[in-house]
Swiss-Prot record:
The keyword Acyltransferase does not apply. GO terms for cellular component: cleavage furrow; Flemming body; membrane; mitotic spindle midzone; mitotic spindle pole; recycling endosome. It holds the Pfam family 7tm_4. It comes from Homo sapiens. Residues 49-56, 120-138, 219-235, 292-310 are cytoplasmic. Glycans are attached at N4. Odorant receptor. Keywords: Cell membrane, G-protein coupled receptor, Glycoprotein, Membrane, Olfaction, Receptor, Sensory transduction, Transducer, Transmembrane, Transmembrane helix. The chain crosses the membrane at residues 25-48, 57-78, 100-119, 139-157, 195-218, 236-258, 272-291. Residues 1-24, 79-99, 158-194, 259-271 are extracellular. Gene3D superfamilies: Rhodopsin 7-helix transmembrane proteins (1.20.1070.10). It is a multi-pass membrane protein. Belongs to the G-protein coupled receptor 1 family. This is Olfactory receptor 2A4.
Length: 310
């Protein structure tokens, strides 16, 4: 047994048990989604950096969300594409651990950034006269750094608990990428502590922040209903709707996967939920956040020269 434990240093990702034609179709489709993700989020970052009118707390946090989405995609999609072209090409032990760590880091950071964005929206709508005094750049930077730091630290805990585990079972991960629960199934030691820490991290990183978001939106809704101007009300509702769509996509899939009974789903269903979470969410987030935002759309028109053409 000891020899087996030390010999397994490479692993195969077997998330796509399909024929060659379907593999090539998925390769083209996922490549397209990957390009759209990079272009969409990259466009948001470019517009925010180019237009001084977008140098506000709301867009500062949106730029961090775009960075997380780009990082999400870059951590998982390239490896998926490699697996589709070369199913027998293994991933190293170090590569597996790094992918698991980064996925967890970006997931936690994204959840916390959405909480921060909810707080920013709460201050903007419920305390508009004090907004600039409350949301100073020092506060914004502190909130963003705290989100990233918390994501890294919580993921380090999982990594520290994962590294000592012996892996003596067949080195086949039946998943699209090295998700922590899929990796734990390969361990030939007791993983109850690891699984309990994943559940505890999911509850603290999902249910707690989501409760904060719900409270914030209850206050926001009360404040919006008291606004006299119908036009201002509609603009506030549009902003809230876009943000809530992103929250629903991110938190909805994550809670179903990690917090429900036995992590919420049969193995295959959970695997495809994770695919949606890591592939489609980063692509959809910039569209949802920006296409309904008039300031971002106007900046894009100016950059593309649409206004001059009209």
């Amino acid at each position: 047994m000891g020899d087996n434990i030390t010999s397994i240093r490479e692993f195969l990702l077997l998330g796509f048990p399909v024929g060659p034609r379907i593999q090539m179709l998925l390769f083209g489709l996922f490549s397209l989604f990957y390009v759209f993700t990079l272009l969409g989020n990259g466009t948001i970052l470019g517009l925010i950096s180019l237009d001084s009118r977008l140098h506000a707390p709301m867009y500062f946090f949106l730029s961090h969300l775009a960075v997380v989405d780009i990082a999400y995609a870059c951590n998982t999609v390239p490896r998926m594409l490699v697996n589709l072209l070369h199913p027998a090409k293994p991933i190293s032990f170090a590569g597996r651990m790094m992918q698991t760590f980064l996925f967890s880091t970006f997931a936690v950071t994204e959840c916390l950034l959405l909480v921060v964005m909810s707080y920013d929206l709460y201050v903007a709508i419920c305390h508009p006269l004090r907004y600039l005094a409350i949301m100073t750049w020092r506060v914004c930077i502190t909130l963003a750094v705290t989100s990233w730091t918390t994501g890294v630290l919580l993921s380090l805990i999982h990594l520290v608990l994962l590294l000592p585990l012996p892996f003596c079972r067949p080195q086949k991960i039946y998943h699209f990428f090295c998700e922590i629960l899929a990796v734990l199934k390969l361990a030939c030691a007791d993983t109850h502590i690891n699984e309990n820490m994943v559940l505890a991290g999911a509850i603290s990183g999902l249910v707690g922040p989501l409760s904060t978001i719900v409270v914030s939106y209850m206050c926001i809704l009360c404040a919006i209903l008291q606004i006299q101007s119908r036009e201002v009300q509609r603009k506030a509702f549009r902003t809230c709707f876009s943000h809530l769509c992103v929250i629903g996509l991110v938190y909805g899939t994550a809670i179903i996967m990690y917090v429900g009974p036995r992590y919420g789903n049969p193995k295959e269903q959970k695997k495809y939920l994770l695919l949606f979470h890591s592939l489609f969410n980063p692509m959809l987030n910039p569209l949802i956040c920006s296409l309904r935002n008039s300031e971002v759309k106007n900046t894009l028109k100016r950059v593309l020269g649409v206004e001059r053409a009209l």
